[in-house]
């Protein structure tokens, strides 16, 4: 999942709402009211189908896939959109004449495994709407990031470093809210020709303060920035660790 995606099991929800579709609309409303952003939601009976459905009716639709219409829906999905299929796998599948779920469905589990290895059994289940992926209720974050696509491309260092200062403050808040600290800071720049550049620094010590994050981001910016218009700027922190755990480790020495 990317940073702006999430799964939610609403079978037994604390709100006591009896309709998953109703919950989806409530989430959309809440997100829009709190952060001013739209989101699309997929509702279904397993993770794979919910993920596939979320890509339809963007930017603010709700797509529901029921057991009754699942197979019909799956058969129309392009093979490159199946969960777990990357560029290399997609090319291999296409060379074998498998372009959509319709082409995938007739093949046996054994055939798929023989031709495509571990991906085969997963595709066999997915195309039948039987994906057995379990929802992970608690997962440690590997990174936290934020980025901004600019209304107008710019070479103005003041504007761009201003965003970095905002990002650093926002990331400090996220870290403290979750009792985390980081060691790696990554700057992302995308120019007017859609060339994306990233550069990272990993520190020896953990940090979680705005001024520390901003200082490193500024250093990266000065190393990366050339006189070309920037369309997007982003800042990500990783190598995260719980601050309570760090404190306990330090107390041992």
Regions found by a protein language model. Name each.
Residues 1-151:
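Nucleic-acid-contacting surfaces of polymerase cores and analogous helical-repeat interfaces
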Residues 5, 232-234:
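Extracellular/lumenal ectodomain signal focusing on beta-strand-rich modules
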Residues 9-13, 190, 238:
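Solvent-exposed residues in well-ordered beta-strands and their adjoining turns
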């Amino acid at each position: 999942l990317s940073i702006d995606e999430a799964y939610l099991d609403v079978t037994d929800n604390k709100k006591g709402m009896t309709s998953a579709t109703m919950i989806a609309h409530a989430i959309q409303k809440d997100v829009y009211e709190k952060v001013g952003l739209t989101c699309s939601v997929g509702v279904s009976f397993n993770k794979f189908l919910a993920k596939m459905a979320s890509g339809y009716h963007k930017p603010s639709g709700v797509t529901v896939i029921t057991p009754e219409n699942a197979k019909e829906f799956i058969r129309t999905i392009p093979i490159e959109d199946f969960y777990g299929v990357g560029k290399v796998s997609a090319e291999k599948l296409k060379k074998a004449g498998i372009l959509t779920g319709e082409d995938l469905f007739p093949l046996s589990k054994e055939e798929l495994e023989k031709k495509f290895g571990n991906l085969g059994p997963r595709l066999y289940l997915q195309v039948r709407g039987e994906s057995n992926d379990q929802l992970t209720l608690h997962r440690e974050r590997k990174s936290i990031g934020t980025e901004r696509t600019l209304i107008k491309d710019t070479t103005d260092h003041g504007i761009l470093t201003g965003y970095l200062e905002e990002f650093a403050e926002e990331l400090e808040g996220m870290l403290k809210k979750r009792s985390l600290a980081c060691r790696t800071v990554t700057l992302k720049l995308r120019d007017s020709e859609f060339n994306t550049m990233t550069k990272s620094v990993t520190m020896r010590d953990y940090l979680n303060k705005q001024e520390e994050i901003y200082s490193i981001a500024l250093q990266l910016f000065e190393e990366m920035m050339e006189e070309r218009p920037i369309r997007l700027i982003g800042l990500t922190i990783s190598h995260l660790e719980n601050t309570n755990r760090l404190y306990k480790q330090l107390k041992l020495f």
